Amino acid sequence: MTVANWQVRDLTLILRTGEMKSRLEQARTDFGALLSETVYFQPSAIRLGEFDDEYIHSRQELVYVYLREDIARQCALRRNLPSNSSNFGTMATAIPPWLMNARSLNRVMQERCDQGGLVNYYQGPHTNQFFLAIMPSNCFVRFGTDIINNENYGFYARGGNYTEEGEDDDDEMDDEGEAGGAEPRECQIGNLINYPIIALGSCDLSA
């Protein structure tokens, strides 16, 4: 089975937290069981019929990209990730959809993203009322952590103005300068990128 054959799980009618947890876990387990452990999925713009070097490990935990309903449904249908920063970056978080209400989550999203991208959290809580459940690829970096109820929840970014957690920007700049600049990497530039979506759901959940 390939990523293209994976049927995105539509969980938008699930309204109870317990059922959402179990359905997401089942989707994660099924995805890992049906695909190989390492999945390459980005069509290569340089080598037609092949894939570039972006991959995901299909046995890892889920992370979530929060967005408004219309964009969420289109992205799930087309297997796309939307940008939520001004220079085409996509930010995901380990914070699950049942952990906080829409307003609290919106404040967290604003702290981690700027005002730009296809999804702009500064427009209000409606911009984070739905989610796409994904697994981060090797192109994602963990750039931050929030502690909520004594639990650590990571933030992960693919592209954009993000620096890996613990990195020193000045050292990175110096290293690149000495090496003659960073090696170019093939990637898709724009507000939407082709990406495996595990599940689509609503954050309007009750206990």
From Swiss-Prot:
Where are the annotated segments for Disordered? 160-183
Offer one Pfam family short name for this entry: RolB_RolC
The protein's UniProt keywords, in alphabetical order, are: Crown gall tumor, Plasmid
Compositional bias segments (type: Acidic residues)? 164-178
Q: InterPro entries of this UniProt entry?
A: Glycosidase
Asked if the Swiss-Prot or TrEMBL record annotates the protein with the keyword Acetylation, the reply is: no
Q: Which residues form the signal peptide?
A: none
Stated role: Involved in tumor formation and increases auxin and cytokinin effects in host plants.
- Name of the protein in question: Protein 6b
Which organism was this protein described from?
Agrobacterium tumefaciens (strain Ach5)
Output the lineage of the source organism: Bacteria, Pseudomonadati, Pseudomonadota, Alphaproteobacteria, Hyphomicrobiales
